[in-house]
Amino acid sequence: KKKIPLSGGMAGGSADAAAALVACDALWRIGLGREELDVLAARLGADVTFALHGGTAIGTGRGERLTPALISGQYHWVFAVSDEGLSTPAVYAECDRLREGREVQAPTVAEDLMAALRRGDSVAVGKAMRNDLQVASISLRPQLELVLETGLSFGALGGIVSGSGPTCAFLARDEEQALDIAAALSGSGMCSSVLHATGPAHGARVVDSGTSGSILSPR
């Protein structure tokens, strides 16, 4: 049952597409391998391939070329959700406008982040969190900056706009702190709802629900 809004910057549509691919393959007994599903996923959208695999990965190209990343431990996340979505094309267009006339460096893998993930160091992960689209999202929705400041003031280890927004993602030290941050954000009146989740998460897969199988979306 979907709990995240459309245009929330959380790849919910991509997760549904991945689940639909797995469901159709199972329902029609096609027997596609992961490589064949990956090809179909890449044609559907940039994040669909990752939603098929889940876990933690480095995405290049449009996001469809994945390299699994080593990670230790479990991470607790709090998501401040807005009912009013942000258009992904509009955010990318705003990013282009803000960068116009400036030299843009090619993206690189943040080695400090990868090392922190390998160690299971949530404090270091929080410090290394970054989203290059965040400036554009805040430019279109200035109140997101206040949401981020509020989450960090309640003790979050790190906070970023998720994807193209407007959802804001906060990393907590543990479940207890995540619930405290979620309660504080819920009472702030700055977001329509707050979600607590843990990661890494599985990709889309068939699960046993008793007498019949069902498809679990990673979202």
Language model feature labels by segment:
Residues 1-9, 155-159:
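Short pre-catalytic strand/loop immediately N-terminal to key active-site residues, enriched for Gly-Thr
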Residues 23-44, 175-187:
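Phosphate-handling active-site elements
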Residues 53, 58-158, 173-179, 183, ...:
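Conserved, helical-rich catalytic subdomain that frames metal- and/or nucleotide-binding sites
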Residues 166-168:
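Conserved glycine-rich beta-strand-loop-beta hairpin in the small C-terminal domain of fold type I
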Residues 8-35, 50-52:
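DPxDG-like acidic metal-binding loop motif
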